Amino acid sequence: MRRMLVIRWILAIHLIATQVFAERIKDIATLAGVRVNQLVGYGLVVGLSGTGDKTGTKFTEDSFANMLTQLGINVPPGVRLNSKNIAAVMVTANLSSFMKKGQTMDVNISSIGDSKSLLGGTLLLTPLKGADGRVYAMSQGNVVVSGISASGSDGSSVTVNIPSGGRIPNGATIEADIPNPFYYSNSLTYNLHTPDFTTAKRMSDAINELMGPGTAKAIDAGSVVVTAPKKLSQRVDYVSVLENIEFKPGEAMAKIIINARTGTVVISSNVIVKSAAVSHGNLVVSITETPVISQPNAFASGRTVATQQSQVNIQQKNNRAFILPKGTTLKDIVRGINAVGATPADVISILEALQQAGALSATLIVI
């Protein structure tokens, strides 16, 4: 009995250890075609309290005149519409792959003219188009603005946040479905967030182990193709099983990411350094210039001359060095660099020098 209990504990520990390093397919890959689609449209916001586009904004006037014409109101030629209660805006929205006709989604409103504020405005019916030029949604509603702007008669003004932009919650109604290969394709393709040959191979092996040989095939470092059921009713259950399969991804390539502007340095866990010695020291050079006035004696024939007297001081702090033995890891690198009191800028210089010396087994990326 005791022996069986020990065996169970060993199996449980092994299972936990395996799960710790395993990741689900849904966390490291996305199904091709299942994505967000951007929509955009041009419209008019009305009902503004004198904070709309100024007189002379031609595209706003033309849009307003065209809208009135479509509503059966004729605008005489040459007549300028000088209403300051109207603003031309761009309307944007994100349409998910599986949203259907009749559902609603949020939209963002952004002024493109010189409107000061969209507070209190109403967006008139605006078609939203996709990249293919088709209309997928219609938007209309009251604009919610979080910013505010106020000005005084003396020209002073105060602006909080951005009053020239806003949102309309559930302000667009979907009128057409997005074409999706999930419904008609004979196979499903998973695209890895971070392409890696080892990860793609292990992912296909994990799927084949559970779903049967030949079900999945890694076609390159970034994609795995999986055979899909022909019946659409079975695909949801099938994908639900696939995306929860756990496996151990391949180890990431050794990289060092450096942000030269902020001094941020990110080092992956696989970075290894060959034998090298690093010396860290600073030269402080100070140059002081003092103006010196040369005044001639009284009644002399000379003239006053101003010259610069320069004094150069060079101070060198105590050089400190540390040795990186072969096979040094991330922990040793950080400890060694910190030991010499290096600043982020010094760390960047040290890492670049190590790579130039051929002692750094990693890809150095400066952003």
From Swiss-Prot:
Tagged with keyword Signal: yes
One GO location term (cellular component): bacterial-type flagellum basal body, distal rod, P ring
A GO term for molecular function: structural molecule activity
Keyword terms of this UniProt record: Bacterial flagellum, Periplasm, Signal
Any one biological process term the GO annotation gives: bacterial-type flagellum-dependent cell motility
Annotated S-S bridges: none
Localization per Swiss-Prot or TrEMBL: Periplasm; Bacterial flagellum basal body
InterPro entries: Flag_FlgI
Segment forming the signal sequence: 1-22
Domain of life per record: Bacteria
Family, per entry: Belongs to the FlgI family.
Subunit structure: The basal body constitutes a major portion of the flagellar organelle and consists of four rings (L,P,S, and M) mounted on a central rod.
NCBIfam families attached to this UniProt entry: PRK05303.1
Function per UniProt: Assembles around the rod to form the L-ring and probably protects the motor/basal body from shearing forces during rotation.
Name of protein: Flagellar P-ring protein
